Amino acid sequence: FEKTGVKNSKIAVAVAGNGVIIKKMLLPQMSMEELNESIRWEAEQYIPFEIDEVNLDYEIISGDDRQDGQMEVILAAAKKDVISEYSGVVVQGGREPAVVDVTAFALQNACELNYSVADEVTTALINIGAATTNINIMSGNRSLFWRDLSIGGNYYTNAIQKELNLSFDDAETLKRGGSVEGISFESVIPILNSVSEDMVGEFLKTFEFFKATSQYSNIDRILVAGGTANIYGLEQVLTDKVGFKVEIFNAFKEIEVNENMFDPQFVNEISSMTATAVGLAMRKEM
């Protein structure tokens, strides 16, 4: 915090991965008071953890507009030890953890701020981190499907490291377009493309599962965010596979940036990797 000059006392963080579960539940219509009383019992049927090991949150996304006496509820559950780990880092930095969100939802907040999406358009948000990729599929601004994949930018680094017998740091340098002694960036392009093919294959499997388990038959738009979004060749591989132009997420697309304080080139360089952070910054303490 001192290095970056962050002065805010309250911090929002996002969690994802195996310790986080998001489920859509279809329940009989009931009052908020009744739902508050029954949510723990309902949650036990959907999450693979002991109920006392998790923190729960939920939101009703449809109810009054349904004619079948049912309501849709989004349930988010995160293991307490995961939350404690993230919160502990904030506390160690002398700040207060005010909000713990789910990465997929923070990404959606940033999308709603920066992109206008028609109700009939199905959009896949893909956030590629170092070790985990978060996918949130939406119809308009309504979330339909979420999945975390245990793949990310480290797959590229590890492949380069293994193929060329390099250190992790040298492999990272090459992955990001640099060169190391005796090895040019051009020589690692085939490795990057091979990993991109594998990674995109996992994305497509997720899309096919979504289409097979929902009423939606197409993905109309794809926005790619995260620190790995701009890896050489990935955007083109994904574009070729899905048959339409994939977009790199711009977290500052609709945000006015003071160019006297922030270098526009730097802002552009970080615009895809800061999508989650921008989404978190929009959150209000509950």
Question: Residue locations for each model-derived region?
Answer:
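Thr-Gly-centered strand-to-loop micro-motif
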Residues: 23, 145-147, 225
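Glycine-rich phosphate-binding loops at beta-strand->alpha-helix junctions
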Residues: 195, 217-253
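Active-site neighborhood for divalent-cation/phosphate handling
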Residues: 14-114, 221, 251-257, 273-276
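Small-residue (GG/TT-enriched) beta-loop-alpha framework at ligand/catalytic clefts
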Residues: 7, 13, 68-173
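Phosphate-interacting basic helix/loop segments used at nucleotide- and nucleic-acid interfaces
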Residues: 1-5, 117-121, 202-210
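Glycine-rich phosphate-binding/hydrolytic loop that grips phosphoryl groups
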Residues: 109, 229, 247-286
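Feature representing long, continuous alpha-helical segments
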Residues: 158, 194-197, 201, 205, ...
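Adenine-nucleotide phosphate-binding core of ATP-dependent small-molecule kinases
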Residues: 173-221, 228
